[in-house]
Amino acid sequence: MRLPCEVEVRSCHLPTLGLKSRGKGVRAVVSLCQAPGRNELQPEARAEPGGHACLLVSTMKDRQGTSYKLRENIEQLFTKFVDEGKATVRLKEPPVDICLSKANPGNLKTLLSAMRLAHRGCDVNTPLSTLKPVKTSEFEKYKTKMVITSKKDYPLSKNFPYFLEHLQASYCSLARVDMRMLCLKNLTKLDLSHNCIKKLPATIGDLTHLQELNLNDNQLETFSVPLCTSTLQKSLHSLDLSKNKIKALPVQFCQFRELTNLNLNDNELIHLPFKIGQLTNLRFLSAARNKLRNLPSEFKMLSLEYLDLFGNTFEKPEVIPIIKLQVPLTLLESCEQAVLFYRIPYGPDIIPYHLCQDLDTAKTCVCGRFCLQSFIQGTTTMNLHSVAHTVVLVDSMGRTEAPVVSYFCSLTCFVKSSDMLN
């Protein structure tokens, strides 16, 4: 059997000599092999004769590998973090620790069980590998990082290595996301910058471990709702949508609660999602060179380290507010407010879809109540330093203020806040 993982082999004598290991593993293939007898010893496999099974550690630099006797030679197995794909094998001779990490937990447990049997001299039920050098193609299968920066290097006739965690495919003239990429379930970072992608498939949301997605310099015009409601909302930390043609982001975009870094530079955005305040973990926000006219009221709820809104077409706050009050409230408005206030679950399987849209796009008054069809809209000016530690100037005049739209559920709330309005 063979196990792809990262391996660090360190001497047990280092602590007594006052030395530390370099503490970094290398990508390797660990094999449980049949150890040859004295008359069967193969020149390419440096194994101890006479044992039943041996452990062979092969790396890209040493494909023949180094073999270690197992029978009555394991001093201790450290398996506290085996569920995280980590374990350490301490041998008596040579006195080394073989530290395994980034392994498949299930396969690692199988290997450790077989090693225990080999140590006791028992028959190992698991099929044993042969003492032969690991082929280069074998390491290719277990690659965790792949960088492609030209069209000629893009693989057309073969699949991507299944264990990839980081994939970059830039300057490849891709018109769509390659469906083969969506089979890479271990991906944590996907970089498709500098291509010609116009639409994202909803199945990107099936990459449950994806933390960083870079789509800089493509031709995207929209960001779909299914992506916003996929498992990415729990895993995605960094999203780069700069240099595209996006005009608007859906309300559901604010369900990416784990986002810490968002780049929206050089798009055609007229406004930001009005529930942007729900992105409570967001620390770095760039939306420079768009067509933003104002900021949503929930923008005040952000707590950023860095903010760049340079080069937008911010409008001057309007003196006269927009009044759309309905007195008395319609029955529909009252019911919708009650659903939101009491947090009653709703969905298209319970109420009509257009009502779900109304509830999803409800505004919040400064008093905390919800506004749907009945509200007063006013505009205030906000100093961006109140939400960000570092602020890039809004324009060449050196300003750091921007207009913010506020909503009021009643005339009373509007009057109380009138001193904040221009």
Swiss-Prot record:
Family annotation (PROSITE patterns): LRR
Pathway where this protein functions: Protein modification; protein ubiquitination
One Pfam family hit: PH_LRR1
Gene3D superfamilies: Ribonuclease Inhibitor (3.80.10.10)
Entry's Gene Ontology cellular component terms: nucleus
InterPro entries: Leu-rich_rpt, Leu-rich_rpt_4, Leu-rich_rpt_typical-subtyp, LRR_dom_sf, LRR_domain-containing
Cystine pairs: none
A Gene Ontology biological process term: protein ubiquitination
Cellular localisation: Nucleus
Function: Substrate recognition subunit of an ECS (Elongin BC-CUL2/5-SOCS-box protein) E3 ubiquitin-protein ligase complex which mediates the ubiquitination and subsequent proteasomal degradation of target proteins. ECS(LRR1) ubiquitinates MCM7 and promotes CMG replisome disassembly by VCP and chromatin extraction during S-phase. May negatively regulate the 4-1BB-mediated signaling cascades which result in the activation of NK-kappaB and JNK1.
PANTHER family linked: LEUCINE-RICH REPEAT PROTEIN 1 (PTHR48051:SF52), PTHR48051
Subunit relationships: Component of the probable ECS(LRR1) E3 ubiquitin-protein ligase complex which contains CUL2, RBX1, Elongin BC complex and LRR1. Interacts with CUL2, RBX1, ELOB and ELOC.
Name used for this protein in its record: Leucine-rich repeat protein 1
Annotated organism of origin: Mus musculus
